[in-house]
């Protein structure tokens, strides 16, 4: 009896399951004549006549695609499971915030080929941006907060501002934010002594606070180590967005902010590619029979360390040690109420997805993709 030898079981199983096209990687090309032979000689007994098509495996820059290497990452504790947002698994991509539409767009763009090639992850990022750019509501979140005090604003005065969820899609509605005497901005948006062409906040310079007023920086306060802890500004009361005075032209940029009065602490998980460079991708072939036996042994051991000494796993030395950075910031209350899996654009920062690890006290957001490909820029 030859059943269930793979070359016999594969076409019969496909036919019984109603498969029309069996898509395989290139190493199965030499098996196709036998696949076709079995289908041809079993046609009278099978409900369908499947066809095998081969294509080159998908390789992506700075991304581990080999199943055995991905398993080593999981079993060795280098990632937090198969759904870790750094993993190229469907569950990992979903948790990262990648949408099904973005994946379909990516697959459509790269197509099928029999030529070995490596696709830049920037293409997948672009597909994600294109999709989320149309779907994600805009919110303000500050990852590295710096307090701003508006010295000519009454301490007990607050203003409720209405902001659109999406500038191009009014049908997505709006939400409110609170404006008051104390706010938070990003630390990088202030410089006591500005660099050349710096057009954000510094003493004597005006900027606009998104959806609110034009403010002028008057000075700052430092701690004993010389670190800026507070920035002092005055408000142009006639410059509220939507009013006549809002048309006044200034040289400064528009900054995002979060009111200190109702700021919600949150955790941001900033993900970057798992590999520091592409040199670890030189051998992404599937395992031999001997490798498969080793994989079974690791399953029994419940950890990968027993096999990580093999030359196969030298790629672990080339992991990006900064593939995950966790920061604590503040975000507007609207984002706290979103359900896990909700995609948002943090203004001027990137696209984020609310993680299932979120609690009532501490929302957690995973960075899906930045507004630009910062990793590729830094690698040049």
Question: Where are the model-predicted features located?
Answer:
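Alpha-helical recognition segments enriched in aromatics with Gly/Pro capping
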Residues: 1-112, 153, 354
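Basic, alpha-helical terminal appendages of large translation-related enzymes
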Residues: 79-80, 90, 95-105, 110-380
